Each structure stands twice: as C-alpha cells, then as structure tokens.
Swiss-Prot record:
This is NADH-ubiquinone oxidoreductase chain 1. Core subunit of the mitochondrial membrane respiratory chain NADH dehydrogenase (Complex I) that is believed to belong to the minimal assembly required for catalysis. Complex I functions in the transfer of electrons from NADH to the respiratory chain. The immediate electron acceptor for the enzyme is believed to be ubiquinone. Its EC number is 7.1.1.2. Keywords: Electron transport, Membrane, Mitochondrion, Mitochondrion inner membrane, NAD, Respiratory chain, Translocase, Transmembrane, Transmembrane helix, Transport, Ubiquinone. It is found in: Mitochondrion inner membrane.
Length: 318
C-alpha cells in the first residue's frame, strides 16, 4: 500500500513537469511569433515523451577527471529533494502532516544547494565550477529573504503548520494585507529556482550551460526534472501562503481544482517573465536582495511582530 501511495504521489508530479516543459516551449514560441513543437503527435503533445525516451536511452558520458561518486549522487539528490518538498503541502490533504511544515520546506530548499555545489565541483571543469559558485551564492542569498517572509507569515498565522494557513485565510487571502511581501516572495522564488531574469547560473554566453555543463542523458534529465518540480513546488507554496488554497472544507475536489488552477496561473507567470525580461547583471541581482529586499522584509517583520503586542491579540490576525 505504501508503494502505491508513493507512486500515486510521484507520477502526477512527473507528468505535470513533463507537460510544463511543453507548455513553456509552446508559450515562448507563440510569444516570439512561431509555433513551437508541433511535429511529434497532434499539436506536438507527445514531445515530452520523445524527449524522455531520447535522454534516457543515450549513453551517460562524464569527464575523465571527474569525481565519479559525487558526480552521480548530485542529480539523484536534486531530484529526491525536489520530490520530498511536496510531501507536507496540503492539496488539500498532505502526504505527511508536519507541525513544522514551513521550517521543513525551508530546510529542504537549503539542502538543494548541495546538489548544485557537488555537481559543479565533481565535474572538475572551470565553467561548471563557476556556474555552481554563482548558483550557490544566489540561492543562499535569496533564502535569507524567503526565511524572513516566512517568519512574517508565521507571526500572522500563529504556527508553523501549513494547514493552519488555510484556516487563517478563510475570510480573506493574505495577498490582500501583505501584497508587498507577496511581490518580494514571488521575485525571490524566481531567483531561488534560477529562472529568468535571474538565470545567471546558465549564462549561455559566458558559462555554456552552468553547473550542469558536463552532464548528459539520464543525469541531465534528472537535473531538468528537479528544476521544473521545484518551480511548481514554489508556486504551490505561494498559493498556500498568500492565495488561500481552500474554498470550502466540505468540497475537497473543488479545493484541489482551485489549488491546481492558482498554481498553474502562477507557473504560467514564470514563463511569461522569461519571455518578457532580459537577464539581470550579477551585481544588480545581489544589490536587489541586500540593498532593497532585506531592509524591506526586516521592516515588515518588525511591523508584524508589533501588531499583536500593540493590540494585545493573538494570531491568526485575519
């Protein structure tokens, strides 16, 4: 039974990730006045399956100078963490109901840094290492703001449990009262997942492909799946934190449909941003965080600490 539950949990994520790549290519295509994939199957719908078959049937090559064990472990770790981050998310029921769900997700997103660092270091090439160092600095930096925003949400919510957030937002979505935090959270998730306009880790013009430049076939596909699973997980988190993932506790199917639609719209915005904005310069990326986001999030955090003290009330505040 446990194996069946695990498969029912993993397979939908894999299918969603596979077709997200197709939606991205189609969306970017139409935004650039071209068709996108349209040969494999009707309207190109079988393109993700063709890509998967191609990648997993190729021979996985590696540099002679690479560190074998770490080179293989890095993509497996990336994919495992990308799947594990989904377990505490209430959709509307979670696979594991954790009291410290918010902390668990923050810890896992911090662990994903190791897969990037190991892949860059184990490749033993300068471009991969430079890409990995960039990615690690960027990810660790933006986790600071994500942690402070989560602390502010926790102060409003009154606990670290994700299910409590649904109860907090029964009357009003948190985006209504904390819209500056929502904007900063969304931009930080773009940087955290290494997406455009913050995709400096891939920097094609100077780093070829970034930390995964030496990967091919199956291991490369694992990194690819992990990246898109993380994107969807982050958007699912945004939905739970700010967009009130539940409508009516009596209709769980309606709640799930609402959750999926909101997450899909947020994910489409990721693709829209990629099509619209040019890449940031690295110093601009760091200045945005340390000179703009950090002071603002700290100020908002102090504000949310002072409200219960000033009004002598206990959370949830909404």
């Amino acid at each position: 039974m446990f194996i069946i539950n695990l498969l029912l949990y993993i397979i939908p994520i894999l299918l969603a990730v596979a077709f997200l790549t197709l939606v991205e290519r189609k969306a970017l295509g139409y935004m650039q006045f071209r068709k996108g994939p349209n040969i494999v199957g009707p309207y190109g719908l079988l393109q993700p399956i063709a890509d998967a078959v191609k990648l997993f049937t190729k021979e996985p090559l590696r540099p002679l100078t690479s560190s074998i064990s770490m080179f293989i472990i890095a993509p497996i770790l990336a994919l495992t963490l990308a799947f594990t981050i989904w377990t505490p998310l209430p959709m509307p029921h979670s696979l594991i109901d954790l009291n410290l769900g918010l902390l668990f997700i923050l810890a896992l997103s911090g662990l994903s840094v190791y897969s990037i660092l190991w892949s860059g270091w184990a490749s033993n090439t300068k471009y991969a290492l430079m890409g990995a160092l960039r990615a690690v600095a960027q990810t660790i930096s933006y986790e600071v703001t994500l942690a402070i925003i989560l602390l502010s949400i926790m102060l409003i919510n009154g606990s670290f449990t994700l299910k409590n957030l649904i109860i907090t937002q029964e009357n009003m979505w948190l985006i209504m009262t904390t819209w500056p935090l929502t904007m900063m959270w969304y931009i930080s998730t773009l940087a955290e997942t290494n997406r455009a306009p913050f995709d400096l880790t891939e920097g094609e013009s100077e780093l070829v492909s970034g930390f995964n430049v030496e990967y091919a076939a199956g291991p490369f596909a694992m990194f690819f799946l992990a990246e898109y699973a993380n994107i969807m997980a982050m958007n699912a988190m945004t939905t739970i934190l700010f967009l009130g993932s539940s409508i009516n506790h009596n209709f769980t199917h309606l709640n799930t449909l609402s959750f999926v639609i909101k997450t899909a719209l947020l994910t489409f915005m990721f693709l829209w941003v990629r099509a619209s904005y040019p890449r940031f310069r690295y110093d601009q990326l760091m200045y945005l965080l340390w000179k703009n986001f950090l002071p603002l999030t700290l100020a908002f955090c102090l504000w949310f600490i002072s409200i219960p003290v000033a009004l002598s009330c206990i959370p949830p505040q909404i």
